[in-house]
Amino acid sequence: MRQVAIYGKGGIGKSTTTQNLTSGLHAMGKTIMVVGCDPKADSTRLLLGGLAQKSVLDTLREEGEDVELDSILKEGYGGIRCVESGGPEPGVGCAGRGIITSINMLEQLGAYTDDLDYVFYDVLGDVVCGGFAMPIREGKAQEIYIVASGEMMALYAANNISKGIQKYAKSGGVRLGGIICNSRKVANEYELLDAFAKELGSQLIHFVPRSPMVTKAEINKQTVIEYDPTCEQAEEYRELARKVDANELFVIPKPMTQERLEEILMQYGLMDL
């Protein structure tokens, strides 16, 4: 079983990318569970046809400790198993703790079955605080992909996430598998992301072009592969799935200093001197 965490800044398209990637892996015959670790609890919406899934934390609040697995785990598109950890009530508690509670509960209830090829954790990545780092800190996820674009804030976040990975890689087995570019159609985007990934000692594993098909599929509450498996964008996600499945380049990243990051951004025209 490969346990994979997908990180990236809020709004970058992590959840969309994760759900389309897992649909691509399903097309390859893989058995998958997706665990949403974002308080927005939208990590599995497309796989479940738009059903707002009841989160682990909401279920715990309503039902107490006697929770059954089938009340927090739902099967979505292609039999992909879906769980949302959820978040605390706004202004109370810590969302990171919710992730810890959820993963522990899934383990107790026997969700990690032997037939699983992949478990994906879709994690909010602007803050690499202790709780959000849980999937990598506790040795749950062994490989990490960061979703980024050619925008400055996405790269700042990706560099920060790399610092978190570096910290926990020394004590555990977690490694960076690569950067996934979710294109924003920024000038020199491919070249910038490729240079950024290489600077970290990693790779740009796939460049996902921007496409109106993604929005169309989302309006229909589906992944692109389910909505129109014949379109070019569906093939992009299948290609991403093939690359992730075949990936063998796992590194402890070498995060950049602020100065070096800004140099790269200037080199590719994102920051004017």
Curated annotation (Swiss-Prot):
GO terms for molecular function: 4 iron, 4 sulfur cluster binding; ATP binding; metal ion binding; nitrogenase activity. Its cofactor is [4Fe-4S] cluster. Pfam families: Fer4_NifH (PF00142). [4Fe-4S] cluster binds at residues 94, 129. Keywords: 4Fe-4S, ADP-ribosylation, ATP-binding, Iron, Iron-sulfur, Metal-binding, Nitrogen fixation, Nucleotide-binding, Oxidoreductase. It catalyses: N2 + 8 reduced [2Fe-2S]-[ferredoxin] + 16 ATP + 16 H2O = H2 + 8 oxidized [2Fe-2S]-[ferredoxin] + 2 NH4(+) + 16 ADP + 16 phosphate + 6 H(+). The reversible ADP-ribosylation of Arg-97 inactivates the nitrogenase reductase and regulates nitrogenase activity. GO terms for biological process: nitrogen fixation. Binds 1 [4Fe-4S] cluster per dimer. Homodimer. Belongs to the NifH/BchL/ChlL family. This is Nitrogenase iron protein 1. The lineage of its organism: Bacteria, Bacillati, Bacillota, Clostridia, Eubacteriales.
